UniProtKB/Swiss-Prot annotation:
UniProt-recorded name of the protein: Fluoride-specific ion channel FluC
Localization (cell): Cell inner membrane
Coiled coil location: none
Organism, scientific name: Oleidesulfovibrio alaskensis (strain ATCC BAA-1058 / DSM 17464 / G20)
Gene: fluC
Membrane topology of the entry: Multi-pass membrane protein
Classification via PANTHER family: FLUORIDE EXPORT PROTEIN 1-RELATED
Keyword field contains Ubl conjugation: no
InterPro entries reported in the protein's UniProt record: FluC
Amino acid sequence: MQKLLLIAIAGGLGSLSRYSLAGAVQRLFGASFPAGTFVVNITGCFLFGLVWGFLEDRLTLGPAARMIALTGFMGAFTTFSTFIFESVALLNSSQWLFAALNITGQIVLGILLLAAGLYLGKLV
C-alpha cells in the first residue's frame, strides 16, 4: 500500500511538472506549433534515460524505487518516454519486427483511433 501511495504522489508531481513546463514553453512559442508537448516529450525521454541510468548504475535502491520514479513521476510526466524506451529495448534485443510494429502501430493506430473517437464523439 505504501508503494502505491508513493507512486501516486510521484505521479501527481509528474503531472504538475508536465503542466508547468508545457504551459511555460507554449507561452514562449505561441499557439502555431505544439512546442509545449514537443519539449515535454523530448525532455521526458532524456530524463527517463537519466533516471533509469542513475538508479541502475549509481543507486541500488531496487525495483520499488525504479517503479516510483519511472512509472510514477515519468509515467505522469510523459508516456512518450516509455514508448521510446520500450521501442529502444526491442531494437537493442534485435526484435526488429516487434520494434517496427510497436513504433508504426502506436503512431498510425493512435492517429486513426483519435480520428475515429473524435468522429464518434461528435455523433453523440
